[in-house]
A protein has these predicted regions:
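Short beta-strand/loop segments at the ligand-binding rim of alpha/beta enzyme cores
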Residues: 13-18, 63-77, 117-134, 177-187
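N-terminal amphipathic alpha-helix/helix-capping segment at the start of soluble metabolic enzymes
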Residues: 1-28
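Active-site-adjacent beta->alpha loops and helix N-cap segments on the catalytic face
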Residues: 2-3, 28-31, 49-69, 78-86, ...
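Glycine-rich phosphate-binding active-site loops on the catalytic face of alpha/beta enzymes
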Residues: 21-23, 43, 94-108, 149-162, ...
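Glycine-rich beta-strand-to-loop/alpha-helix junction loops that act as flexible
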Residues: 52, 184-190, 208-211
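Catalytic domains of carbohydrate-active enzymes, especially glycoside hydrolases
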Residues: 37-50, 93-95
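Conserved, mostly hydrophobic/aromatic
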Residues: 41, 60, 91, 142, ...
């Protein structure tokens, strides 16, 4: 059965999305490994997975039956999360049900506006679009541009908001209170079950957790740091 927009929205409502990503040079930087991590997360109850890179998206699509949110990080500064339409098209072709893109108001490398990018994705693929935002103004602009989902992903990573220690629940609430009429997904620095629960209580449609579940190097460092007395 094809996953329609409404089915995906319903599948994510009040649920956990697990982000499975490893970075170049890390021991787990392997597409088969990421597929196994994603499958393990689904077995634990994840309603969807968020995956970076074409090879990983393809491997994860073959390993799980839940919605896959795909992205392509190109670089590590500025607009680098699925920064152009060509990146987005490749992510959709790899099998992503939802393409996550930089949803800020910053200039995009290919010169297209966010609205033009989203329109082309909708016209040329069956994928939905998640706009990773850094501020309320980003969210309002992304909603107007035609995004299917809004995320707090880039809160604290642009100049518009300070980087909070935990999730930016203030931004989450303001996005929801703005009545954008689009599902708002909480993402970014959600490190504990209680923080995920707080995000749902604040009105998030769904919650993305990555590092705290799928990045052993960072999780181990938290324990090591806490034990230093």
């Amino acid at each position: 059965m094809a996953l329609t927009k409404q089915l995906i929205i319903e599948a994510l409502a009040g649920r956990l999305i697990v982000s499975a990503q490893a970075y170049p040079g890390e021991p787990m930087r392997d597409s088969r490994t990421m597929a196994q991590v994603a499958a393990s997360a689904v077995r634990g109850g994840a309603a969807a997975v968020r995956v970076q890179g074409i090879a990983d998206i393809q491997a994860v699509r073959a390993a799980v039956e839940v919605p896959v949110i795909g992205l392509w990080k190109d670089g590590n500064a500025g607009v680098y999360i699925t920064p152009t339409y060509q990146h987005a098209y490749a992510v959709a072709l790899a099998g992503a049900h939802v393409v996550a893109v930089d949803g800020t108001r910053r200039p995009r490398p290919d010169g297209l506006s966010l609205e033009q990018t989203i329109t082309r994705i909708h016209e040329n693929t069956n994928a939905l679009v998640m706009a990773d935002c850094g501020s309320l103004d980003d969210a309002l602009a992304a909603a107007k541009a035609g995004a299917d989902f809004l995320g707090t992903t880039l809160a604290g990573y642009t100049e518009e908001r300070p980087k909070t220690t935990g999730p930016d629940l203030e931004l989450l609430r303001t996005m929801i209170e703005a009545d954008v009429r689009i599902p708002v997904i909480a993402e970014g620095r959600i490190h504990t079950p209680s923080q995920a629960s707080d995000a749902i209580r604040a009105g998030a449609h769904a919650v993305v957790v990555g590092t705290a579940i799928t990045h052993p190097t960072t999780i181990t460092s938290w324990f090591v740091d806490a034990m230093e007395v």
